Curated annotation (Swiss-Prot):
Gene3D superfamilies (UniProt xref): 3.10.20.30, P-loop containing nucleotide triphosphate hydrolases, TGS-like domain
InterPro entries documented for this protein: ATPase_YchF/OLA1, Beta-grasp_dom_sf, G_OBG, GTP-bd, P-loop_NTPase, TGS, TGS-like, TGS-like_dom_sf
Species for this entry: Schizosaccharomyces pombe (strain 972 / ATCC 24843) (Fission yeast)
Superkingdom: Eukaryota
A Gene Ontology molecular function term of the record: ATP hydrolysis activity
Primary location recorded for the protein, binned into one broad class: cytoplasm
Single GO cellular component term: cytosol
Binding-site list for ATP: N30, V31, G32, K33, S34, T35, M233
Location of the TGS domain: 306-389
Binding annotation for Mg(2+): S34, T55
Pfam families to which the protein is assigned, alphabetical: MMR_HSR1 (PF01926), YchF-GTPase_C (PF06071)
Protein name according to UniProt: Obg-like ATPase 1
Length: 392
């Protein structure tokens, strides 16, 4: 008798559950954060002032997630309404050295970082005497180190306070199931505190078990959030694809935050493109033999949150719905309306690639590509769904 196949252990995902997740734009003052926010949202919110705290309260915007599949479906169905997937982006006030102790807008800044689920970290890699750097000169490695150090200090302080509370509870000695759970939590958080204070590495870089990740997720630690590094160069450097700071920044990320994404870009160039129509912007990029990095930045942020999308399609509307990786069919249906989840019967599912290949829904059915899926079906990015629900 052949040995039983071991069931694959599903890795617990970092971060909050749910699909309404947010990215925050983080960096030192005057590195291009607010200008980047204005470019990514194509909104005119007034020029950011040339001083450290131009953005006192976080600005929020929803940006459409570029998706060629969605564009094709809209062309195929020609619907009256087209609703893409969206990514929520916050512009957060600049961090300064000492933020963890309340310097500048430190406490407000760190609370805003805690409220987001992923980070776009804008790193200044351009020289400009007219744009003051809060530290006096341009040094991307120093800036990177300041930010990670401030986040690590705040995480360690938060974990230490949490541990103090747990120790008081577990010292009472009661041998209940609740107490056993608290002792397990304490042991994990002791390990987390040791990791933060001894390795000086972001918590997301540690090797953690599923149970440990669950406990860490409950703490909303700053260094548990995925980070995408946006290296803001001058337009000249971006167009010639050469920058004196870039190799040093890449080396720092490889050594201190291995595996994190680095995207070279020019905020000045991206902002200039927003002054054009779409056709003019495309023509300008062709003329300069380059392209906007905003689509890549948005998609990378969306993916960093472990988000995927599925579609509902018809003559009235083509819509992209955001869900987390690993979402099952009833919960995916529930994103449209909670009744669809509660009274879920089945989903009729075909995949975008099959519709693209076979061209019509009828051809997909004839080829056996339009399938009925039940409650245990795990959604895939690019699924096209028609939900059937019963009476509650």
């Amino acid at each position: 008798m052949p040995p039983k196949k071991q069931q694959e252990v599903v890795k617990v995902q970092w971060g909050r559950p749910g699909n309404n997740l947010k990215t925050g734009i983080v960096g030192m003052p005057n590195v291009g954060k607010s200008t980047f926010f204005r470019a990514i949202t194509k909104s005119v919110l007034g020029n950011p002032a040339n001083y450290p705290y131009a953005t006192i309260d976080p600005e929020e915007a929803k940006v459409a997630v570029p998706d060629e599949r969605f564009d094709w479906l809209c062309e195929a169905y020609k619907p009256k309404s087209r609703v893409p997937a969206f990514l929520t982006v916050f512009d957060i006030a600049g961090l300064t050295k000492g933020a963890s102790t309340g310097v500048g807008l430190g406490n407000a800044f760190l609370s805003h970082v805690r409220a987001v689920d992923a980070i776009y970290q804008v790193v200044r890699a351009f020289d400009d005497a007219e744009i003051i750097h809060v530290e006096g000169d341009v040094d991307p490695i120093r800036d990177l180190s300041i930010i990670v150090d401030e986040l690590l200090i705040k995480d360690a302080e938060f974990v230490e306070k949490h541990l103090e509370g747990l120790r008081k509870i577990t010292s009472r000695g009661a041998n209940t199931l609740e107490m056993k759970a608290k002792k397990e939590e304490q042991a994990i958080i002791e390990k987390v505190y040791q990791y933060l204070t001894e390795t000086k590495q972001p918590i997301r870089k540690g090797d953690w078990s599923n149970r440990e990740v669950e406990i860490i997720n409950s703490l909303y630690l700053l260094t548990a959030k995925p980070v995408i590094y946006l290296v803001n160069m001058s337009e000249r450097d971006f167009l010639r694809q050469k920058n004196k700071y870039l190799p040093k920044i890449k080396k720092w990320i490889d050594e201190n935050s291995p595996g994190d994404t680095l995207i070279p870009m020019s905020v000045a160039f991206e902002e200039r493109l927003t002054n054009f129509t779409e056709e003019e912007a495309i023509e300008e990029c062709k003329k300069l033999n380059t392209k906007s990095m905003l689509p890549k930045i948005i998609v990378t942020g969306y993916n960093a949150l472990n988000l995927i999308n599925y579609f509902t399609c018809g003559e009235d509307e083509v819509r992209s719905w955001t869900i987390r990786k690993g979402t099952k069919a009833p919960q995916a249906a529930g994103v449209i309306h909670t009744d669809f989840e509660k009274a879920f019967v089945v989903g009729e599912i075909m995949h975008y690639q099959d519709l693209f290949d076979y061209k019509t829904e009828n051809a997909c059915r004839a080829a056996g590509k339009y399938l009925t899926k039940g409650k245990e079906y795990v959604m895939e990015s690019g699924d096209i769904a028609h939900w059937k629900a019963g009476k509650r």
